[in-house]
Amino acid sequence: MTDKVIEFKGKVSGLVDETNVTIAIYGEDLDPDDISQQLGCQPTFSHRQGERRSHGSPPYKQGAWFLEVKGNAPHGPEDLTKALLMRLPADETIWVELARKYDIQMRYGIHMDTWNRGFELSPKLVQRISKLHTKLSFDIYAVGGNDDA
């Protein structure tokens, strides 16, 4: 019997390669200026219901307000989420009121250059996120192929 040796030719494990973290607020009657005033910061992008992305594009069905941070390893989801949250109010009553009127989402875009990457969020950060009364959404993209291993 011959022992086979499996050789890995690529990098496995480690922190995800690229991350986008976005707080997204949606609502039919959403006024982006009002949201900016309540949160004390300007959005990365926003629009009102009925506005158009460009001439000829369909009108938006609802208003939206987005604040996004992006980064690459070694800055992963934990660091970027903290950076995003530092720009937003910690007062939970603001978020309770917003969640009563609007759909709030914390969205993660996770990009990997190979098939095996990961990340963790600390208990303290998860507790802070919970005070936003938001859904969490994860879009995960693995652009590398199995030929890396």
Where in the sequence are the language-model features?
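Acidic (Asp/Glu-rich) sequence patches and key acidic residues
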Residues: 1-119, 123-149
